[in-house]
């Protein structure tokens, strides 16, 4: 059965991170990468994804999973309107393998111009290293899929993990229509659990 149309899909590909940001909603990094079989098991039921968010931890630490996602959406013929990844701007986000994987995602997605931002965005806030920021900005700026998240002044945070400020993380319902359209934010976490929020 490959009938699902998903409005918002988020896959947490890793819980590893190379920073310890005080605002991190994920909490302490864990040495956990999503088993690739969980990605395949979910995507084999999907026909169309409007917005596909690849998250972590730091996504650039698990390029293998990003490549697997691209391989599966191609193999299953899944239409993806747009992908979205946020990086912390560390050295791994400047790696050739990460940039190549992002370029391949960008080529695959249907929409090249996104109203809400770019396919790959770097956090631009008071929590990240300015030296890393400058080096990553220089390395990634030439790519059409890259942009800065643009929230240096105001950051919307949930009060979870190490974050001591912000709002409670809301839990939203997931709804499946008779036409197999999934409404809501569907999230596959690194442990293989399907959740209604990230």
Indicate where each model-derived feature is located:
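Conserved alpha-helical substructure of the radical SAM core
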Residues: 1-87, 92-97
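Hydrophobic transmembrane helix bundles of membrane-integrated enzymes that assemble
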Residues: 23, 138-144
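Acidic (Asp/Glu)-rich catalytic clusters
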Residues: 42-47, 72-77, 100-115, 137-140
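Active-site beta-loop-alpha junctions enriched in small/polar residues
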Residues: 57-59, 88-90, 125-127, 151-161
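A generic structural motif
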Residues: 82-85, 117-120, 144-170
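Non-cysteine beta-strand/loop elements that form the S-adenosyl-L-methionine
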Residues: 111-128, 149
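Accessory C-terminal segments flanking Radical SAM cores
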Residues: 163-198
